[in-house]
Amino acid sequence: MKKLLALALVAPLLVSCSSKKGDSYNEAWVKDTNGFDILMGQFAHNIENIWGFNEVLIAGPKDYVKYTDAYQTRSHINFDDGTITIETIAGTEPAAHLRQAIVKTLLMGDDPGSIDLYSDADDVTISKEPYLYGQVVDQTGQPIRWEGRATTFADYLLQTRLKSRTNGLKIIYSVTINLVPNHLDKRAHKYVGMVRQASRKYGVDESLILAIMQTESSFNPYAVSRSDALGLMQVVQHSAGKDVFRSQGKSGTPSRSYLFDPQSNIDTGTAYLAMLNNVYLGGIDNPTSRRYAVITAYNGGAGSVLRVFSSDKVQAANIINSMAPGDVYQTLTTRHPSGESRRYLYKVNSAQKNYRRR
């Protein structure tokens, strides 16, 4: 089993993860992605062997999942639900394993490139500027910055909120911590300056950038997915990333470390939004109709958006230009072949309305 785990864990070296697929994939990347899917399936299978049936958790766009202690302890931050769950199946001193994981999770920094979410390496370091600072408060209502306060809170949680459940012959011990009610806003606030800079650089509305970030990752800088998207705006290295680099006169594709850097990720994602707006979908005259098309294309590609209206790109733009923006929205949310893309437009458009009101 250790050999299989080792095989699964080389996946990040082969290809990065993601949630959406663009139009410009090359054959080699498709092969890499298929291989990555196989490796991730094996990784999930081995986690199931260790934790038991229905106990597989793997990091995703809105879920930070980190295994330690030979995969016997894990930290799970659900950025959508606003919960942190620390669990262990360690047979000896489970409270000690939970305490250490609680402290490190509460005090970890915001450098995704330093943490391997696909190994049990003890690579989560305590930061002077914890990523979760202000998103979690202790039993006295105070935010947690220092190790002493985090340890005291961990002991309090172990005394008052420790739970256990059985799965086969395994006992799973867990502690759940709720993030503060406005945790989403607190995370978004961390990136407002970077968003404003990218907005001015590329001429993309700040509210749209923030809405894309919320929908893609819930402002999780550790965001990964199984199809090759990385970081806050879930940029795909070999499609959007490559297109942006080419437009900027750079060769190759952005690296994992580049896209895990929040500022670089936001810059690249915003540059791609500008390309969709000004180049790929620039033939759409009405700015509202074009915005609906750009949002949908960020998820499923510009080609798939135009093909909803016609197989001919010029004719598709002409048809869109003959329609009212509301009809374009209705068409994209009901006739786009991808259910994910149909829902994506609704989610981003709704989120953008909230950011526009601020």
Swiss-Prot record:
GO terms for molecular function: hydrolase activity, acting on glycosyl bonds; peptidoglycan lytic transglycosylase activity. A lipid is attached at residue 17 (S-diacylglycerol cysteine). Residues 1-16 form the signal peptide. Its main location: membrane. It is found in: Cell outer membrane. It catalyses: Exolytic cleavage of the (1->4)-beta-glycosidic linkage between N-acetylmuramic acid (MurNAc) and N-acetylglucosamine (GlcNAc) residues in peptidoglycan, from either the reducing or the non-reducing ends of the peptidoglycan chains, with concomitant formation of a 1,6-anhydrobond in the MurNAc residue. It is a lipid-anchor. PROSITE patterns: PROKAR_LIPOPROTEIN (PS51257), TRANSGLYCOSYLASE (PS00922). It holds the Pfam family SLT. GO terms for biological process: cell wall macromolecule catabolic process; cell wall organization; peptidoglycan metabolic process. Keywords: Cell outer membrane, Cell wall biogenesis/degradation, Lipoprotein, Lyase, Membrane, Palmitate, Signal. Its EC number is 4.2.2.n1. GO terms for cellular component: cell outer membrane. A lipid is attached at residue 17 (N-palmitoyl cysteine). Murein-degrading enzyme. May play a role in recycling of muropeptides during cell elongation and/or cell division. Belongs to the transglycosylase Slt family. NCBIfam families: PRK11671.1 (NF008670). This is Membrane-bound lytic murein transglycosylase C. It comes from Enterobacter sp. (strain 638). The lineage of its organism: Bacteria, Pseudomonadati, Pseudomonadota, Gammaproteobacteria, Enterobacterales.
